[in-house]
């Protein structure tokens, strides 16, 4: 599996790659149906925001709805990323139809993303422990629903694997499997959840990532969990998804 909160993790993963350890992508196919360059998402101007679809939330609203720096969720602690957003435009997929499984950054997709807030959730002091990248994104023109459609297509088209391309390395995804999604309840329009099996850079070890994305109106909440090791840890901790969802709903739909 897309990295749990990691420019922390992804940053750690990159450091391990460059140090010759194992990560090629414990974090996170092509071309559209109309052909073209399979290695990059099709460019072109983004569609203008239309009146269709729910109103996009502002960055201030997303910030209020997200975990705060230092907030605790059971044994986990939330923090802000210090090296920029995780799963940024440095991450692309080959073939390109798999891009939503790697990164939904504005510069590598054609969706009208208006605002984004990113948090890292992990166990304080555990460098090699489980880490979750929590990303809240708001879209205009009904594009949040199109993000979920693209994610669903990627999950089907890329089931047998694809390549994640980064500036310092390539990661081989061996398998993309749908898994049981959490029950978010009222306000959740649709949910997708996946398990990724990833080959380490040396081509010897199998790593695991899990991705859960839920849409509520114009907003998507993405949870990507990873572990720097070969253990299949079973999925994104529901204590994290539940706590973030509850906080999000308390802000966007109080009462």
Model-identified regions with their sequence ranges:
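Short, well-ordered beta-strand elements
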Residues: 132-135, 218-227
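Post-signal-peptide N-terminal segment of Sec-exported extracytoplasmic proteins
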Residues: 53, 60-89
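A small/polar (G/S/T-enriched), proline-flanked helix-loop surface module common
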Residues: 77-206, 240, 252-255
């Amino acid at each position: 599996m897309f990295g749990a909160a990691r420019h922390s993790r992804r940053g750690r993963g990159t450091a391990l790659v460059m140090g010759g350890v194992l990560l090629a992508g414990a974090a996170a196919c092509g071309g559209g149906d109309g052909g073209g360059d399979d290695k990059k998402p099709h460019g072109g101007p983004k569609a203008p925001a239309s009146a269709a679809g729910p109103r996009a939330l502002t960055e201030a609203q997303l910030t209020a709805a997200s975990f705060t720096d230092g907030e605790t969720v059971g044994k986990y602690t939330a923090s802000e990323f210090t090296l920029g957003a995780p799963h940024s435009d440095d991450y692309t997929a080959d073939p390109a139809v798999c891009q939503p499984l790697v990164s939904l950054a504005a510069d590598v997709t054609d969706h009208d993303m208006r605002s984004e807030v990113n948090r890292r959730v992990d166990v304080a002091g555990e460098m090699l422990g489980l880490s979750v990248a929590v990303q809240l994104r708001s879209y205009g023109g009904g594009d949040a629903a199109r993000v979920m459609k693209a994610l669903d297509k990627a999950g089907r088209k890329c089931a047998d694997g694809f390549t994640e391309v980064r500036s310092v390395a390539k990661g081989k995804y061996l398998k993309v499997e749908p898994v049981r999604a959490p029950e978010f309840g009222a306000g959740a329009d649709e949910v997708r959840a996946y398990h990724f099996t990833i080959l380490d850079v040396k081509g010897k070890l199998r790593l695991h990532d899990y991705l859960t994305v839920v849409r509520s109106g114009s907003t998507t909440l993405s949870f990507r969990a990873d572990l720097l090791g070969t253990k299949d840890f079973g999925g994104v901790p529901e204590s994290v998804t539940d706590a973030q969802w509850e906080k999000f709903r308390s802000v966007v739909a109080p009462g």
